[in-house]
Amino acid sequence: MAVGNGVLLHIAASLMLFFHVQKLVQYLWMNSRRHRLPPGPIGWPVLGALRLLGTMPHVALANMAKKYGPVMYLKVGSCGLAVASTPEAAKAFLKTLDMNFSNRPPNAGATHLAYNAQDMVFADYGPRWKLLRKLSNIHILGGKALQGWEEVRKKELGYMLYAMAESGRHGQPVVVSEMLTYAMANMLGQVMLSKRVFGSQGSESNEFKDMVVELMTVAGYFNIGDFIPSIAWMDLQGIQGGMKRLHKKFDALLTRLLEEHTASAHERKGSPDFLDFVVANGDNSEGERLQTVNIKALLLNMFTAGTDTSSSVIEWALAELLKNPIILRRAQEEMDGVIGRDRRFLEADISKLPYLQAICKEAFRKHPSTPLNLPRIASQACEVNGHYIPKGTRLSVNIWAIGRDPSVWENPNEFNPDRFLERKNAKIDPRGNDFELIPFGAGRRICAGTRLGILLVEYILGTLVHSFVWELPSSVIELNMDESFGLALQKAVPLAAMVTPRLPLHIYSP
């Protein structure tokens, strides 16, 4: 039966009305959501808030939070960025909504440094990440695995003590970060590859240290191309070019180490190392299998995060002790009472030294190795503290700001280990469950090396404090405590100090 023109016009008009009403409802709904976005600063055209971050983004964001509150929303380029600046805000994102923020956003560091996100740090939360994490926990980073290579840590630290004692004997200052990088890289080399990466502390180990510092610095930059992908190819800041050049250096080093490891396989019969375990168990029930590129990327994670993050906290802690000699003497008195002065500091001593543990917690609080957590991204739209967070929003947790929150910490800019001996703070732990102190992050993507990081800081710092008298060189009038921003928070001026053995000299023999 034919349909009249009037009926067709009526149907068309109804469809048009429905379409416009639908669009209006959608607009009003979206507009109401926008009004519920967290507060934040108004940025510049195109760049958004990028220019507001400056050279010290963690400080700039902490200052913004004083005005806009614990959860902020910034438009950075074409991307939304949510920033959590208090323990409660961090808990909302990293615990309550942990699964929704378990992935990383695309970024130049993952692409150009981490073999296109083939590593454990930047990989999506999925089968490959789970396999890398599992192997790392079982064979190097978990509690049982750490016990298995305790003797390696003791031996390599012995080499470092000898080198430091020799420097002291010759009246030469010790550059703390160089010594720490040398020792930690060799610790990891022994357990991962069955070899010391550096035969002695010198130009080769210092070059490696410089490479690690450069990687942690450039990886922490707010790269314009990450936030305005359409112009990433222009590399306006030169960051991507620097990453590519640095990647070539690391890849050459890792390729050489892998080739040497393969050539020496016959020497490890019956004594497999971490890399042997990874190669032998590089697949899982979900069909994921590790390739050479994944192994290189994993080794890169271990050698960079495993050396730089812990060494920076130890360096900051020693600097604070030199500025606060009363705290240094009290720590040494505690150790002398428990350990004495006729043997070396051992890992088993740590649990008997509450003041040392408090010093380490205070260093984690005031000088977190990672001031802004590695970014995450919202898989779905969600709500936090009554605020709407759109899908695809990047998340930054300001760990530095949380550690200096005056509503949580009394006199937060003061280095005061006693705060962790007080009843209300005594049980606060840096392992990711107490959001007042999360130097390693929290949730599913918490740093895989949390146990190792805490152990190295406590063990190495305790050993250095127990083993030496520490003084600043006579040429240093006032210790520089300025920060240098990056993925890891470095001292702007590396700490150099004069050391004198305070134990019998035979203890320093390697």
Curated annotation (Swiss-Prot):
SUPFAM superfamilies in alphabetical order: Cytochrome P450 (SSF48264)
Keywords: Heme, Iron, Metal-binding, Monooxygenase, NADP, Oxidoreductase
Binding site for heme: C447
Cofactor: heme
Catalytically driven reaction(s): a 3',5'-unsubstituted flavanone + 2 reduced [NADPH--hemoprotein reductase] + 2 O2 = a 3',5'-dihydroxyflavanone + 2 oxidized [NADPH--hemoprotein reductase] + 2 H2O + 2 H(+)
Role summary: Catalyzes the 3'5'-hydroxylation of naringenin and eriodictyol to form 5,7,3,'4',5'-pentahydroxyflavanone and 3',5'-hydroxylation of dihydrokaempferol and dihydroquercetin to form dihydromyricetin.
Family: Belongs to the cytochrome P450 family.
Official protein name in the record: Flavonoid 3',5'-hydroxylase
